[in-house]
Each structure stands twice: as structure tokens, then as C-alpha cells.
Amino acid sequence: MNNRLTSALLAASLLFALTLASCGTPAAENSTPPTAPPAQGSQVLEADKPTPAETAGTSEDVPSETPAASGSNILVVWFSRVGITPFADGVDAESSASINIRDGELVGNMQYLAEFVAEETGGDLFQIITEQEYPVAYRDTTDLAKVEQNSNARPALASHVENMDQYDGVFLGFPNWWGTLPQAVMTFLEEYDFSGKTIVPFCSHGGSRLGRGPQDIAALCPGAELLDGLAVSGSAVSGAQSDVQAWLDNLKLD
């Protein structure tokens, strides 16, 4: 009797083991491997008119924090609707106001200038990105900018500098919208203490150069030293490197 019971138990155990083995391959083999998160870029890129290079897309395509500290004491900041506006793939740069193409990508004027300034100064790059996207149509953007200015709005920002204390000098690039800084740039300036820092403005414009920009910067950052800025016509940005170089040389930064 005992022998029969033992044999029955062994047979049942063997059948159970075979059933488990036939239930399929391990989950790891059947599941799709998780997609690696996109690498965070060290920069992102504008203007009064967006110019030669920037990927069409939304603000989700843009890093939201300062690049990893490089040891530089110079930060090159810029604001552009390119990078926070959902331009469609294949947008016609020639027929669209303020849009330019470089190496197959959209780029804002301010990104174009900021990258050159960073290259020449060894500064870190940072783009001011708003939580709200801006309209694709340039006229709609300028209309929105006017509404923001009339209400003295402070658009919420999605990008923030985590290590501002590292920087002694800040180059600040912006498009001249309605005679001065975009309201989002004012949000940026009010977010940090610039006391003891040097601010150097540069802008793209459609005829009014820096406008009230320097005065507004001085009012928002009373403890900062403000150096002479550079104004580049939006239609001349792609050929302005010699002008930018001469301006940088004259600044005689430490």
C-alpha cells in the first residue's frame, strides 16, 4: 500500500513539473524591453525672427535645466519662440516670417547668436522655455506678446537654472518684441538675484534695435552691472559673426 501511495505521489509531482515547464517562456523574453530615456542635451536654442537651426517641435523637445556644470563662470541665456512653438515638419522657412533653416533644421535667431557667443566665450548655454506654447503664425505670436506686455504678465517658465551662483557673467539674448524684452524674459530676470553679476544683452530686431531692453533690465536687476549690448537685424543674423566677434572683443571681459 505504501509503495503504491509513494508511486502515485511521484507521478503527480512529475506531471505538475511538466505542466509548469510548458506554461510559456519567461516574461523577460516575451516583454518588450523598456525604451531608454532620451539623452538630455547640453543646450537648446531664437529671435525676433527664428533663424538658421532648430528642430521643429514643442517645449517637450527641449531640456528644462542648465547643462551639467562645466566650470565656466559665464552663462549664455536666450529666449526664442522657436523651440516652444509646435512648428510642423517641413515648414516653409522662406514663406514663414521669422523662420530659417540650417542643416535641415529650424533655428531661431537668438539660438544662432547665442551658440556663437558661447563658443567664443566658453559659456554654458541655457534657453528660457515657457510652460505655454506660442502660436505657429508669427502675427498671432506678436499679438499674444502685445497682450502679455499690456497686462505686464509674467509667463510661467518650464526651464530653470539650478546653479546660478556659479555664474559671474550672463549674456542675455532676446527678440525685441514691441520695443523691449519679451515678458517671459522678465520672468527669468525676476527669478534670480543678479546682484554683483554682469549682464550683457543682445537681441534681434526689426528696426528698433535694443529698444527699452537695457533700461528694463537695469530696473529688474538693480544690483547688476550692465554692459553695452548688441542689436542685430533679424534678416542679418546668419551673416553677423564678424559683428558679434568685434562686439565681444570690445567688451574686454575678464
Task: Please identify what each model-predicted range represents.
Residues 18-22:
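C-terminal motif of bacterial Sec signal peptides marking the signal peptidase cleavage site
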Residues 113-120, 124, 173, 188-192, ...:
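Structured segments of extracytoplasmic/periplasmic soluble domains
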Residues 107, 111, 115, 182, ...:
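Short, surface-exposed alpha-helical segments at coil->helix boundaries
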Residues 135-222:
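Helix-loop-strand module that forms the ligand-binding subsite of alpha/beta enzymes
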Residues 24-25, 37, 44-167, 249-254:
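N-terminal beta1-alpha1-beta2 submodule of the flavodoxin-like/Rossmannoid cofactor-binding fold
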Residues 97-107, 172-175, 201-207, 233-235:
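Second-shell loop/turn segments in exported
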Residues 1-10:
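Bacterial N-terminal signal peptides that target proteins for export
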Residues 225-254:
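Glycine-rich phosphate/pyrophosphate-binding loop and the adjoining helix
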